[in-house]
A protein has these predicted regions:
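Periodic glycine anchor positions in long extracellular repeat architectures
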Residues: 142-147, 183
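Gly/Gly-Pro-rich "capping" loops immediately C-terminal to redox-active cysteine motifs
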Residues: 46-54, 145-173, 191, 224-225
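Mature extracytoplasmic or organellar-lumen-exposed domains after removal of signal/transit peptides
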Residues: 18-126, 131, 135-136, 216-272
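Sec/Tat signal peptide C-region and signal peptidase I cleavage site
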Residues: 11-17
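Short Fe-S-cluster ligation motifs
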Residues: 168-184
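Bacterial N-terminal signal peptides
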Residues: 1-10
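Axial heme c-ligation environment in periplasmic c-type cytochrome domains
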Residues: 50, 89-98, 158-160, 179-210, ...
Length: 272
């Protein structure tokens, strides 16, 4: 179960802390998972899925354990305090946006402090991503990314439905890359670290585009061509890879954010 996986991760912390970047990367992944999946557990301050809520509680506890195991530096105590605050917000069943902000801010700090890889070295090859998806992913996630592949039956938790627009808007290409690289403890999602970095980024961008249709991509292409503000939001591949539709909507508004995200997930070379 996810609970047992988290306990196992926690018990191994002193060993894993020998590699601070790996430990920080795992903490980042948990924070990203919390930011994306918390709304499935809590809505309007009420528990709507007890199993999901238990996972959120365990994941926030695990983040604190992992950060505590990292070598102290000048920001160590402050990061531990932020992790404790996030744990308290989950315990209080705080609003999803507040959870996403808190988890996202701490995750961004980890990227910077531990220099976690946050962008592809070259423009992702979407055709390669599509081919890899067909070979490696359809059994669980389904041919169109709906989480309905032939091997998905009985999986607990079920495979991610990449076409779920509500969750997709909180998920960056970077978060998909990290899950592809490391797997997700407590689920059937294994690590694909045997693939090259380029292949993993190609898969991340391809799966990150499955929630968007051709109309949204076309609208995004038109906006990108004419909207200088939109182009300033995405100056390079690093900015694009770390961006979520939800974050971009704070600057561009919901409609433009969705269209631009749809276009650039399919045409990342536009920012290169």
């Amino acid at each position: 179960s996810v609970f047992l996986a988290v306990v196992a991760l926690a018990s191994a912390r002193t060993v894993r802390a020998a590699d601070p970047v790996a430990e920080a990367r795992q903490a980042w992944q948990l924070l990203d998972y919390i930011a994306v999946d918390y709304p499935a557990a809590i809505q309007n301050g009420q528990v709507v899925d007890a199993v999901e809520y238990a996972e959120m509680q365990e994941f926030t506890a695990s983040v604190g354990i992992k950060l505590a195991a990292l070598p102290p530096d000048s920001g160590h105590a402050a990061r531990l305090a932020k992790a404790k605050q996030l744990q308290g917000l989950v315990a209080e069943r705080a609003d999803a946006e507040q959870i996403a902000r808190s988890a996202g801010a701490l995750a961004s700090e980890l990227l910077t402090v531990y220099k976690i890889e946050a962008a592809p070295a070259a423009v992702p090859d979407l055709a390669r991503g599509a081919a890899l998806y067909a070979q490696q992913c359809t059994a669980c996630h389904g041919a169109t990314g709906r989480g309905d592949g032939p091997a998905a039956g009985g999986m607990d938790p079920p495979p991610i439905a990449f076409t779920d627009a509500d969750r997709a808007k909180h998920r960056s290409a970077l978060s998909l890359y990290q899950v592809i690289s490391q797997g997700l403890p407590g689920t059937a999602m294994m690590s694909y670290a045997h693939l090259s970095n380029d292949d993993r980024w190609a898969l991340a961008y391809y799966t990150g585009g499955l929630a968007y249709d051709a109309a949204a991509r076309d609208q995004g292409a038109a906006i990108w061509a004419d909207d200088e503000q939109a182009r300033r939001v995405f100056p390079d591949l690093a900015a694009l890879s770390g961006a979520t539709e939800a974050d971009v909507s704070k600057t561009l508004g919901a409609d433009r954010a969705r269209a631009i995200t749809a276009y650039l997930r399919g045409e990342p070379g536009a920012v290169a």
